[in-house]
């Protein structure tokens, strides 16, 4: 607008200047050729100013109209977007109001029987389910935990042995058990240390017979000299360089380096009270014709042969007592055949004292 005002003022000023020149020329009747040229130049200037002012005015008007049109379009788009949002919110509010009024319809319109029946059915279906839903979620949380971690069955009570005995069995080493087996015990407590593994002889039952109890207090008296002490000493010296294996439960083995000296057995009621070494006696009846054909089993140990002669009508009982039951003890009773000789072959499994008692009645 300021530019338009300036152009108008400029045109007015130029026109006034031209009027003044014309008045001066009329006053002076004589005009020269130079003045005529000046008048033409001024006219050109006037025309140029008019053209420039017209172009400026038209440009300004066009720009203003463009700005107004753009601003109006943007405002219309903004108002249209606002109207759409308002319509969406109004529709949502109307739908929520309709649902809320439908839920409260039994209180407002009690006169409609159809609405009352539908509402009563909905209340019956939703009413009892609401208190049940809370424990159902809790049950869902509890059930998988109970399924994942089943209750372990209670361990059965041990009746076989008392707690102190079980602790002794756990903490006892094979050496200590073997040493305690050699200790003196009363007759009621004497039992095999390994009752689970019974020792069975490989010989037929026809060659075996039960041993009869001997009522002698000591198998070898103190005053009588030991006849074959040298053979026993040789055996003990030889045993020092041998490693004997002791049978143990669950595959345990004990290597014994030094054997104990010879101990005299003290027998009472077919059981030994001193030595409880496990042995397997084997008895074969060998006659004079079959002495050369004695069956020699394949043992890992050396077989010891003991010979005894028996007198007529005076039977003797030679029994090797060890850590075994009564059924495993074998003896030889020579009532009728006293002239024969007997070979006793023992399969030695652990450290034991081998000795020979000869007694002349």
Swiss-Prot record:
**What Gene Ontology cellular-component terms does the record carry?**
membrane
In which residue ranges is the amino acid composition biased (Low complexity)? Answer: 144-158
- Full protein name: Uncharacterized protein CXorf66 homolog
The record ties this protein, via PANTHER family, to: GENE 7073-RELATED
Q: Which residues lie on this side of the membrane: Cytoplasmic?
A: 69-361
Extracellular topological segments: 18-47
Q: Which residues cross the membrane?
A: 48-68
Annotated coiled-coil segments of the chain: none
InterPro entries in the record: CXorf66 (IPR038873)
Instruction: Tell me which positions the record assigns to the signal sequence.
Output: 1-17
Cellular localization per UniProt: Membrane
Q: Which UniProt keywords apply?
A: Glycoprotein, Membrane, Signal, Transmembrane, Transmembrane helix
Q: Where is the composition biased (Basic residues)?
A: 169-185
- Spell out the residue ranges making up region: Disordered: 95-197
Q: Which residues are glycosylated?
A: 24
Membrane-topology annotation of the record: Single-pass type I membrane protein
């Amino acid at each position: 607008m300021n530019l338009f005002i300036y152009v108008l003022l400029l045109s007015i000023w130029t026109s006034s200047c031209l009027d003044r020149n014309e008045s001066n020329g009329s006053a002076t009747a004589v005009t020269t050729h130079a003045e005529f040229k000046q008048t033409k130049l001024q006219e050109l200037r006037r025309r140029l100013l008019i053209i420039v002012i017209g172009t400026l005015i038209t440009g300004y008007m066009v720009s203003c109209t463009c700005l107004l049109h753009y601003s109006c379009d943007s405002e219309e788009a903004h108002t249209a977007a606002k109207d759409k949002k308002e319509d969406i919110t109004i529709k949502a509010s109307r739908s929520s109001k309709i649902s809320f009024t439908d839920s409260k319809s039994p209180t407002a319109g009690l006169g409609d029987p159809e609405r009352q029946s539908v509402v009563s059915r909905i209340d019956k279906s939703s009413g009892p389910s609401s208190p049940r839903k809370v424990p159902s979620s809790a049950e869902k949380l509890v059930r998988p935990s109970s399924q994942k971690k089943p209750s372990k069955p209670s361990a059965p009570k041990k009746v076989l042995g008392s707690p102190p005995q079980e602790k002794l069995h756990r903490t006892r080493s094979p050496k200590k058990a073997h040493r305690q087996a050699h200790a003196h015990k009363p007759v009621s407590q004497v039992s095999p240390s390994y009752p689970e593994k019974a020792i069975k002889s490989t010989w037929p039952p026809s060659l075996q017979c039960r041993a009869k109890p001997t009522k002698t207090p000591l198998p070898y008296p103190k005053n009588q000299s030991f006849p074959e002490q040298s053979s026993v000493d040789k055996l003990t010296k030889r045993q020092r360089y041998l490693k004997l294996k002791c049978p143990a439960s669950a595959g345990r083995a004990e290597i014994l380096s030094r054997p104990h000296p010879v101990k005299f057995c003290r027998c009472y009621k077919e059981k030994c009270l001193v030595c409880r070494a496990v042995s397997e006696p084997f008895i074969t009846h060998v006659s004079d014709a079959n002495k050369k054909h004695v069956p020699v089993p394949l043992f890992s140990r050396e077989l010891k042969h003991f010979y005894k002669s028996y007198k007529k009508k005076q039977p003797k009982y030679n029994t090797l007592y060890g850590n075994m039951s009564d059924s495993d003890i074998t003896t030889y009773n020579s009532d009728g055949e006293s002239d024969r000789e007997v070979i006793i072959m023992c399969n030695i499994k652990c450290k034991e004292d081998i000795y020979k008692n000869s007694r002349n009645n």
